[in-house]
């Protein structure tokens, strides 16, 4: 039951962070492009790479810490459902170029940020 609590706690923190970060970033840029979701997903991609390389592979942290940080915190911080809906909305609104930039950018940059996080975690 302790692992479930760790996931729930991390998820609550990650979801609150996602809400706040998305809102701040979206308001800062003030554009219709879904930059808030892109930002939190890229931050999450970076940290999942970092956490796996450093905490899991190097430090071998216990399952509760992994559940709290990776499944909970990063699972709550990142959002596939919002990404999917925003992508669909761009298509529905006829914003084909924005749709392509958003979907390709999220996927390509997400993998790249995961790679960067992993490399940083390995180097520590």
UniProtKB/Swiss-Prot annotation:
GO cellular component terms attached to this protein's record: plasma membrane
Pfam families on file: CRCB
Membrane topology label: Multi-pass membrane protein
InterPro entries the record matches: FluC (IPR003691)
GO MF entry, a single one: metal ion binding
Transmembrane segments: 1-21, 35-55, 68-88, 99-119
Residue sites binding Na(+) per the record: 75, 78
Keywords: Cell inner membrane, Cell membrane, Ion channel, Ion transport, Membrane, Metal-binding, Sodium, Transmembrane, Transmembrane helix, Transport
Activity regulation remarks: Na(+) is not transported, but it plays an essential structural role and its presence is essential for fluoride channel function.
GO biological process terms, semicolon-separated: cellular detoxification of fluoride; fluoride transmembrane transport
Catalysis performed (reactions): fluoride(in) = fluoride(out)
Chief localization: membrane
Annotated disulfide bonds: none
Subcellular localization: Cell inner membrane
Protein's job: Fluoride-specific ion channel. Important for reducing fluoride concentration in the cell, thus reducing its toxicity.
Protein family membership: Belongs to the fluoride channel Fluc/FEX (TC 1.A.43) family.
PANTHER family (UniProt xref): FLUORIDE EXPORT PROTEIN 1-RELATED, FLUORIDE-SPECIFIC ION CHANNEL FLUC
Protein name as it appears in the record: Fluoride-specific ion channel FluC
Taxonomic lineage of the native organism: Bacteria, Pseudomonadati, Aquificota, Aquificia, Aquificales
